[in-house]
């Protein structure tokens, strides 16, 4: 028999509300609607299927405050992560939302009605407090960046009534709800289940540690990877799932099953580990593997970890009695070539030879085509990863040129386009500032917000082209650091390559050589909000290359960029 759900009752709202489906669907058509974002869809799916039990909706202010402050809901149940529905004031005003209102929650992908929410309250969160209490307060933390830059200013709390499941078109048979997974465990006769959370491909070491955990507890293994929102730059879930499927036959027959979790991760370290344990308990697991730096976002710009390596393990251990799921501490294993086996590092005698391959080295081997030994990963897994990891020489990239108007960006961009076309091997796209303004952003002005929007449109196009293998040369002014960083994230989040080139031609030179007289007009006040005159240009702090047309020729600058790309492996060296 599987583990009881968190809070004692599985809140399967889809099953609960199924008898009222037609009635709710009809009502939903008459109500104002909130179109959910991708992260909100992930959250709603796990609310409706019971993955977030005991939640029955998005948190009201009382629950939200308690979770932030005390790691538990207002009713006393342990819960570590705020699950909130953020909306703008414009949405609230347009739909005249208030406490007691009912509102339809709609899927942005297909416009389907998913649920009706009855509003308990509408409140403005203290984002700084949430950031500090939940994630630690470091402004470089991706969850805090998301909170400050993307999350809207108001939260709406209230219970939901489920109408429709989210439509998925990939790996449908592996997307078990908690109720379905519990039935599956019962059918298999499993009573002890070790759940393994991952957002990365699995290799021999992962197989070894999960088998060891199961063997020590006379249990079976649930491989439960996240296929919702993970960390930008992660390998896409399509590739990962194919790799998990290839790995599964390497387990003893009947030991392991694969199920997919459509979770939007926050990379919240200790808080997230508790949350993950609750989710796995709701899916019927009795044990949960918590690794070193579990759900941590990596390092900040200073090279420092956001959390201690064992903070997550300590957090889950602190609440193990309330959680009702046994914590299995992730043991780092290493390969012993002399005996052809994996062992936990703390069990390896001094002087015994060991071998390891870091994540960075693995990515480099995939990128360059270097061999990956069978002691590290299985050939069938490596084959799948290689199919999805094109060599650098065939990958796309974005060269993002930023600088004052008339700094030479456009001349460099055009010359670079010709050079890359001559090089061959990939299509080349040019996104000049004036062209994009005319074709994509003609309705935008030059306020800070409009400039940011314009740069994000450029980044979206650049990201799509880059992921398709093209060379993209973008040359907006892009005066703000925030906008440039967001552009970088937009290109790299799907695995794209991004290079920031600061065309640092001095303002005086740009003005002196301005044959169109635009700077003169700005100085006379005929043009407002002009970068370098009455609007600032924020010097990039993270440029890959800094060039200056007042001291260099366009030809030499293009050569510098080509050399940078060659050094990074973007041209075939065969």
From Swiss-Prot:
Which keywords does this chain's UniProt record carry? Allosteric enzyme, Amino-acid biosynthesis, ATP-binding, Cysteine biosynthesis, Cytoplasm, Methionine biosynthesis, Nucleotide-binding, Nucleotidyltransferase, Transferase
Show which residues form the site (Transition state stabilizer).
203, 206
What are its E.C. numbers? 2.7.7.4
Which pathway is it part of? Sulfur metabolism; hydrogen sulfide biosynthesis; sulfite from sulfate: step 1/3
| Residues that coordinate or bind 3'-phosphoadenylyl sulfate | 434-437, 451, 477-478, 516
Subcellular location as annotated? Cytoplasm
Activity regulation, per record: Allosterically inhibited by 3'-phosphoadenosine 5'-phosphosulfate (PAPS).
Q: Which PANTHER family match?
A: SULFATE ADENYLYLTRANSFERASE (PTHR42700:SF1)
Family according to the record? In the N-terminal section; belongs to the sulfate adenylyltransferase family.
The text the record gives for the protein's domains is:
The adenylyl-sulfate kinase (APS kinase) is non-functional. It is involved in allosteric regulation by PAPS. PAPS binding induces a large rotational rearrangement of domains lowering the substrate affinity of the enzyme.
Name-wise, this protein is Sulfate adenylyltransferase
- The organism of origin for this protein: Aspergillus clavatus (strain ATCC 1007 / CBS 513.65 / DSM 816 / NCTC 3887 / NRRL 1 / QM 1276 / 107)
What gene is behind this protein? met3
């Amino acid at each position: 028999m599987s583990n009881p759900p968190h809070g004692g009752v599985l809140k399967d709202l889809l099953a609960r509300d199924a008898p009222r489906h037609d009635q709710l669907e009809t009502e939903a058509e008459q109500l104002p609607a909130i179109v959910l974002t991708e992260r909100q869809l992930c959250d709603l799916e796990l609310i409706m299927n019971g993955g977030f039990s005991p939640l029955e909706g998005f948190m009201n202010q009382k629950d939200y405050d308690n979770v932030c402050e005390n790691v538990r809901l207002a009713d006393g149940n342990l819960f570590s992560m705020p699950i909130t529905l953020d909306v703008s004031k414009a949405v609230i005003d347009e739909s005249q939302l208030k406490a007691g209102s009912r509102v339809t929650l709609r899927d942005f992908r297909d416009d389907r009605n998913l649920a009706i929410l009855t509003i308990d309250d509408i409140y403005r969160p203290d984002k700084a407090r949430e950031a500090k209490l939940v994630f630690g307060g470091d402004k470089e933390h991706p969850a805090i960046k998301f909170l400050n830059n993307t999350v809207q200013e108001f939260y709406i709390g209230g219970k939901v009534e489920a109408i429709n499941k989210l439509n998925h078109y990939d790996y449908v048979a592996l997307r078990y709800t908690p109720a379905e997974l519990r039935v599956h465990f019962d059918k298999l006769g499993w009573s002890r289940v070790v759940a393994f959370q991952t957002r990365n491909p699995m290799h021999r070491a992962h197989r070894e540690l999960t088998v060891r955990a199961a063997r020590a507890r006379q249990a079976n293994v649930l491989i439960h990877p996240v296929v919702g929102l993970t960390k930008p730059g992660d390998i896409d879930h399509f590739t990962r799932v194919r790799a998990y499927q290839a790995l599964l036959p390497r387990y003893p027959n009947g030991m392991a099953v694969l199920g997919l979790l459509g979770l939007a991760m926050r990379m919240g370290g200790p808080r997230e580990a508790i949350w993950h344990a609750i989710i796995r308990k709701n899916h019927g697991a009795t044990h949960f593997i918590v690794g070193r730096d579990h759900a941590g976002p990596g390092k900040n710009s200073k090279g420092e970890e956001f959390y201690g390596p064992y903070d997550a393990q300590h957090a889950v251990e602190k609440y193990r009695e309330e959680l009702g799921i046994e914590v299995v501490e992730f043991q780092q294993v290493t390969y012993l070539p002399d005996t052809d086996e994996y062992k936990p590092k703390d069990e390896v005698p001094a002087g015994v030879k060991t071998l390891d391959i870091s994540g960075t080295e693995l990515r480099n081997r995939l990128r360059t085509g270097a061999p990956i030994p069978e002691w590290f990963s299985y050939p069938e897994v490596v084959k799948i990863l290689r199919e999805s990891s094109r060599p650098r020489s065939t990958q796309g990239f974005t060269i993002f040129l930023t600088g004052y108007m008339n700094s030479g960006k456009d001349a460099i961009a055009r010359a670079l386009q010709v050079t890359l076309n001559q090089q061959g091997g990939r299509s080349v796209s040019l996104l000049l500032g004036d062209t994009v303004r005319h074709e994509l952003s003609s309705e935008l002005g030059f306020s800070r917000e409009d400039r940011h929007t314009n740069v994000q449109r450029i980044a979206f196009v650049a990201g799509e082209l880059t992921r398709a293998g093209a060379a993209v040369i973008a040359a907006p002014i892009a005066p703000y650091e925030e906008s440039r960083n967001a552009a970088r994230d937009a290109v790299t989040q799907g695995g794209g390559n991004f290079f920031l080139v600061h065309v640092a031609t001095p303002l005086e030179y740009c003005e002196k050589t301005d044959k169109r007289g635009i700077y003169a007009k700005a100085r006379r006040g005929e043009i407002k909000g002009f970068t370098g005159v009455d609007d600032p240009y924020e010097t990039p702090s993270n440029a890959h290359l800094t060039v200056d047309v007042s001291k260099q020729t366009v030809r030499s600058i293009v050569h510098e960029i080509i050399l940078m790309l060659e050094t990074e492996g973007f041209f075939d060296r065969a």
